[in-house]
């Protein structure tokens, strides 16, 4: 294996390492799983058709749903969609997916972080969170109803917020977590603020 070089054997060992770690976790030989980055181009194959760890773990544990949850000391960001082309994001933003992710984040904040009543911010999909329907309909037709439904399920969530102003004004500091609609919307500010200290929880 040559560090920094894509090789078939490197990709093969990355998959085998992850597979063995999952097996050990299922058999209760270990209590937790910590992963290192994998190079998607080097591991994707018929054997591993996943876009990253999160969908692989969902399949491996036959989970109904999972959430990509990025955590640092000063900020926590979860995603509704993960590794998708931007052109496909809107079609994957559904009321059901938003509610499901909110429930998962809420559960994690309570169980894993010991927060009794977590406050979760929800970002809009479109610029300025749609400007009340002037720039896209997703906020009015999907995101707001999802927030309302999540609240009825005892999830203390608010939004949708315009992502640029939300992070620029430090509003994220008032919440225990943020739910972003897509990868770059959430991870660009997260990585900028976490400065190398964040992990995919």
Q: Which positions does each model-derived feature cover?
A:
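Anion-binding alpha/beta catalytic cores of soluble intermediary-metabolism enzymes, centered on
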Residues: 1-138, 143-201
């Amino acid at each position: 294996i040559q560090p920094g070089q894509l090789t078939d054997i490197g990709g093969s060992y990355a998959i085998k390492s992850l597979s063995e770690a999952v097996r050990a976790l299922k058999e209760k030989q270990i209590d937790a799983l910590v992963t290192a980055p994998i190079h998607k181009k080097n591991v994707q194959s018929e054997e591993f058709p996943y876009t990253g760890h999160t969908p692989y773990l969902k399949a491996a544990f036959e989970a109904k749903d999972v959430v990509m949850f990025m955590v640092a000391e000063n900020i926590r960001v979860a995603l509704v969609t993960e590794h998708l082309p931007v052109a496909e994001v809107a079609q994957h933003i559904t009321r059901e997916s938003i509610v499901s992710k909110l429930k998962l984040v809420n559960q994690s904040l309570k169980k894993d972080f010991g927060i009794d009543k977590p406050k979760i911010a929800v970002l809009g999909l479109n610029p300025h969170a749609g400007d009340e329907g002037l720039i896209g309909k997703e906020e009015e037709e999907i995101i707001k109803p999802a927030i309302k439904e999540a609240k009825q399920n005892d999830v203390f969530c608010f939004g949708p917020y315009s992502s640029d102003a939300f992070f620029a004004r430090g509003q994220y500091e008032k919440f225990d977590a943020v739910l972003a609609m897509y990868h770059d919307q959430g991870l660009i500010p997260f990585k900028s603020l976490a400065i190398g200290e964040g992990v995919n929880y």
